[in-house]
Amino acid sequence: MSIATTPIETPKSPKSTEPQVRKRKKVSTVCTNCRKRKIRCDRQHPCNNCIKSKKHNACVYDDGQVSPANFSTNGSSHGNTVPESRPYEESARIPIRFDAEAPRKKSKPNTPNNERKNSKKSPDNTVANNQQTASENEVTITLSELNMLKQRLQNIEANINAQSNPQSNPSYVPQTPAYPTQPNILPPPVSFNSWSPKQSNERVMFSPQQRLTTNYNVSHTRGQSPSIQLPPLSFKDTPRASIDSAPLYSEMSPPRSDLIASSLTSPESIQMSVSGDVVGVNPYLNETETINFYDGYTSICVRDFRRVNHGPFAWSSLMRKDKALSSLWNHILKKKEKKNVASQTFVFGQDVHEISQENTQLVASESNESETKFKKKTLETFGFNDVVPYDILKKKLQTQINKTTSPLGLTLYEEQVNMELQLVDRIHQQLPKKKVLWKLIDRFFSLLYPFMPFLDEIDFRESVTKIIGETEYKDEKIKELKVEKRLDLAVIGVLLIILRMSYLSLFCNKESVNEMRLKTTDPSPEAQDMKYLLQNPIGISLIDSAQNCLQYFDIFRKTSMPVLQCAYFLQLYHIFAPEDGDDGDGADTYALNSMVVRMAYSMGLNREPDNFKDVLNDKRQNHLGRKIWHFLVIGDVHNSYAFGTPKLIGDDFYDTKVPFIEEGNENLIDKSLDQYVTKSVFPGYFSIYNSVDQILKLILSVSRRSKVSEICKILNQFEIGIAEQYGTLSDCLKPKENLIHIFARNMPVKMYISLKSFLVSVYFHLFLYYEHKNDSLSFFYLRKILKTGAGDIMPHYFELLGNSEVVCDMVINPKLIQIIHKANQINIALIIRVNMSIYRMKNSQHHAENCKKDDFYYSYYKELCKFSSCLTRCAEVGIAAVSKLSTRYYYAWKITKGHNFLLKTITSMEFYEKESTNAQEITLPKYKLEQIADLENICEVALNKLGKTSVMGDEFCSNVNYKKYKGDQTYSTSSESSSTPNKDSPLDSRKYTNDFGLDLVNNQEIDKIWLQMLSLKSEEAQQQRQQESQPFTSSQSQSQSPLTSANQGYMPRPESRRGSYYGNTPFALENLNFDGFGGQSKSSNNGEADLSSFDFFVDLPFDQLFTN
C-alpha cells in the first residue's frame, strides 16, 4: 500500500537566525511538542509534558513513532485519564504547507545561506495555538529530504500494520462485521490536487477566505509518484475498561478505537472554521475513482401505458437508490399485499398490469358518490381516460347531446369560434367585481411583479382596459367582455392567473393573522382593502379557464408574446399554487417549462435585440424580452439542481444580454422599482451560476462517469461562494433596513434554501457512494448532511413559516415544503440504519453481559440509542412544521400523512423483526464512538433551539432501553442533553416555534377537505370533457364547494369550519373503501391533473394512513 505523507512545518522563533532546514540526518529522540517548546522531554510514549498539556495524541517523534496513547485502551501509559479533545484541534494548529521555491533552486547547493533565503521567501500563515505566536516559519523540504521521508514511511507502515494485525494483539477477539469494512489500517488518503515532486512546483496552499480558515490541499496521486501523508492522528479515546477484561463480543460489537488508526488527511481531522463547520472541503478517496449519479437504481418508472423518468435528486430516485428506504417501501408493500394481492405502486411496481374493464367503466361513469369520484380522479390522473374505448364515449356524448341544448344553439360539432365565444361567456361569469379586479392588479404590480417580471404594465393595463372597460374601483360586476380577436384570449388568460396569485398572496401562514385581517375594525385604507379582498375570493376555476384560453392557440407551430406570457404564468402558478405544487420531483412543470423554452427559442428571445436594430427597436419590448429569457435560464438551472432534470438551454445557443438599466426601457409605471429589480436579480444569481453549471454537467451526465475529484473541487468553490454571498440562513433572515421591498428580503432566503437543498442531495449521493467503501468519508458527508439540514435549516422551520416581515409566504412555502420533504426522507433513512444497528446489538447473545462488563460497549450502545432519539425528534419536528401548512397546501398534507405513517412504521419493532434478514445492507457503518457522539450533538443543539426534548412515539425506544443494564430503571425518551452546548438558546429562537407549536396538525376535517377536493377535481374534469355538448349557465358557475366558497385559499381551523362549510353533502372519510381503492387502481395518484406526476401518498395503506 502506498502511503502518502504531507510535510508539516516546525515552528521557530521569529528572531532566530539559525538555518531552517535540518542539517543532520540523525533522528531526534525528543518529541516534536517538547522540541517546539524547547523543554526537556522524558522520551516516554507519550511524554509527561504532552500529558500535562493535553497533547498526548500529538506526541510524535521524528522516527515516525506515534505515542501508544493513540492505540492504547487506557488513555495513557501512566494510567491517567486524558481529558477529551476534538480530533482536529492539533491539525488546525499545524496547517499543511509546501515550499514553492525550494525545488526551483536545484542548481544551487543547499548551503545554509541559500536555505535561509528560501525560507525567508515563504509566506507565514501559520495558525498558532495559545502558546505560540503567529509568526512561525515553515520548514522547506527538498527532493533529497522527500526521499528520506519516503524511506521512513516504509518503516511507519510496517509498524502500523504490525499493530493492527489481529494476531499480534492477544486481547483481540475476531469479529464478523455486518457488512464489508476497511482493514484496520490507515485509511486511504484524501485528495484535492495532484502533486508530484518532478512536476513544476506550484503553490498548493490557498489563501484564507472571508469568514473561512485555510483551505487545505492535501496532495495524493496513485500510480504517478509516491504520495505524501502526515503521520496518523487518532481520535480521543473515551475512558473505558481495559480490553484485557476479555468481554464477550457478538458479531455486532462496536468498532474499537484502539484498533483503528486515523490520518490527518481523514475527514475527521479537517477543520475549516472556528465553529466546526467544514466549508469548502469535500474530500475523496483517490484521483481515479468515478461516479455516476444514475447508478444503483432505475430512474424510469413504467406502469401500463405510462412511463416517467426522474432525475437523481427527485424523492423517488433517492427512495429507490437508498437500500434502507427501499426496504421500508418493500415492507409497506408486503403489508398491503396481505390484504390485497393485486396492490401495486407505481414507484416500485414490477408487473405490467392490463387495463381492466372495471377501471374503464369507472373512468366513464358519472356517479356522484364521493368514493367513486375519488377513485375516478386517481385513475384519470394516471391517464386511464386516454385509453377508454371510443364506443363507450360515443354513447355517452350522444346521450348528452340529445338531452341538453345550448341557449345559443351551440352543439359539440359546431365551429371553434363558437367554442371560444362560449369560453368568453363563462369567463365573464367568473370574473370578480371591478374593484376587486383592479385592486388585485395593483397588488400584483406593486408586490409580486419583482418575482415574475414578465409583463409590461403599461401595455397590459391598456389591453385589459380594451377588454373589460376603463379602470373603475366600483363595487359592481363587469358588464361585458369585448373580445375582438383570438389573441385577446391570451391577455385574458394572463389576467385570470395574476388575479388568482394576487389573491393567494393575501394569506399568511399564521391563522390568527388571517382571522384578524378578515374581522378587522381598523379604519385605515390598507386594512380595509385587505379585508375587502379576503371577503371576495378568487376561485380555482379561473385557472382552468386560463388553461382553456391557452389551448386555442397553435403553440406547436407559431406563437406570440401574449401567448408566451400566458404559458409562462401558468407554469409559475403550478409551482406556487397551494392545491398544486411541484410534488418534490419536478415532473409536474417540466413538460410545460420545456414548451415555454421552445416557444422562446422560436420567437428569437435567445438573440440580443441590439444585433437586429432594424426590426427590434422598441426599448421596452427589448427589455421585457431580455428579462423573460434570463428568467427562463435561471428557472432551467433551478430545475436541474432541484430535481436533476436535464438542462434545456445551452450557453452556446444564446447571446441575449443580461437585462440592464436604460432610460426609457422600464416596464413598470414605478420606474424605480423596475430599475431595482433589474440591478438586483440577475447579478446576484449569475455570480454563482458558473459553479452550479459546472457541477450539473458532471452530475447529470448519463453517458459517462465523472471523476469524484472533479466534482469535489468544484463543490469546494461552490460552498465558499455560497458562504461569502449569503452567509448562513440566520444572516438571510435578519431584516435589512436598506432593503425596503419584500423581494429583496425574500430572494436571498429562497436562493439559500434552494442551493442548500441541492448540496444535501449531492452529499447524500456521496454518502451512499462511500457507505461501504470508506467509513471516514461516509461519516464526513453524513456529518455535512446533518450540519446543513439539522444544524443550519431545521432551527428556522417555524421562523420561515411565521416571519412574514422578511419572507413572502406564498413564494417561500413551496421551497420550504420541498426541503422538509428531502430532510425528513434522509432522517428516515438514518433512523432505519441506527435502529437496525441497535436491534442487532440488543438481540445478540451476550448483549446484556457486555453492557454490564464492558463500559465501552455500553457507551457505544447508549450513544446509538441517544442518536436514534435525536433523529426521531428531528423527523417529528419536520412533520410538525409541514403539518402547519397542511390546511392550505395539498403537497404539505400529503407529506404530513405519508411521513407520519412512515415514521410510525420505522419506530416499531415489527419492521426490524421482519427486515432483519437484510440487516447487513441497512445497518449504520461502524463509526467510532466519538463520531456518533458528534452527529448526535449536531442534532441535539438544533433540537434544543426549538425546545424539542421528547419523542412522541417511543415504542422502539422503550424496547431498547439502555438504562436498565446499569440498574437505572428511570427512562425518558428524551436525549440526555445536559452536556449539550448552547443550552440556553436565545428567546427569539423559540418565538416562532411557540407561535405554531410542535404538535402535529392531524385532523379528519382537513383530510376531508383535501379528499373532497380530489372528488371535485374529478367532477370538473368530466365537465370539461363534455363542455362542448353542455351549455354554460350562471347557476352552474355559482355552485359552492370548499374551494370556491368565501373561505377559499384561507382555511381556518377545523372547529370554525363545521356546519355549512362542507355544503349539503359532506365528504365522508369513513365511507371510503381504501382497500378496494388500492386494488382497483393498481397505480393511483395524488389527484393532480398532470400525468407526469406520481407520489408515494396513494401507495400507502389508506386504512392505516388515516388512523390517528
From Swiss-Prot:
Q: Which is a Gene Ontology cellular component entry for this protein?
A: nucleus
Q: Where is the composition biased (Low complexity)?
A: 970-980, 1023-1041
**Which sequence ranges form a coiled-coil region, renumbered to this chain?**
134-165
For molecular function, the Gene Ontology terms on record are: DNA binding; DNA-binding transcription factor activity, RNA polymerase II-specific; zinc ion binding
Q: What is the effect of changing residue 683 to S?
A: Leads to constitutive MDR1 overexpression and multidrug resistance
Does Cell wall biogenesis/degradation show up as a keyword for this record?
no
DNA-binding region(s), residue ranges: 31-59
Instruction: Please note every region of biased composition (Basic and acidic residues).
Output: 86-104, 114-123
Q: Which InterPro entries match?
A: OAF3, Transcription_factor_dom_fun, Zn2-C6_fun-type_DNA-bd_sf, Zn2Cys6_DnaBD
Query: One Pfam family of this protein, by short name?
Result: Fungal_trans
User: Where do the record's region annotations for Disordered lie?
Assistant: 1-27, 68-138, 968-990, 1021-1064
Regulation: induction: Expression is coordinately up-regulated with MDR1 in drug-resistant, clinical isolates. Expression is induced by HAP43.
Q: Which BP terms from GO are recorded?
A: DNA-templated transcription; positive regulation of transcription by RNA polymerase II
Q: Which Gene3D superfamilies match?
A: Zn(2)-C6 fungal-type DNA-binding domain (4.10.240.10)
Polar residues composition bias: which ranges? 1-19, 68-83, 124-138
Localization (cell) = Nucleus
Q: Which CDD domains match?
A: fungal_TF_MHR (cd12148), GAL4 (cd00067)
Please provide the record's keywords in A-Z order. Answer: Coiled coil, DNA-binding, Metal-binding, Nucleus, Transcription, Transcription regulation, Zinc
- Knockout-associated phenotype: Decreases MDR1 expression and leads to greater fluconazole and cerulenin susceptibility.
Q: Which domain of life is it from?
A: Eukaryota
Q: What does this protein do?
A: Transcription factor that acts as the central regulator of the MDR1 efflux pump. Other target genes include those encoding oxidoreductases, whose up-regulation in fluconazole-resistant isolates may help to prevent cell damage resulting from the generation of toxic molecules in the presence of fluconazole and thereby contribute to drug resistance.
Q: Which PANTHER family match?
A: OLEATE-ACTIVATED TRANSCRIPTION FACTOR 1-RELATED, TRANSCRIPTION FACTOR DOMAIN-CONTAINING PROTEIN
Spell out the protein name for this chain: Multidrug resistance regulator 1
For this protein's source organism, the top of the classification is: Eukaryota, Fungi, Dikarya, Ascomycota, Saccharomycotina
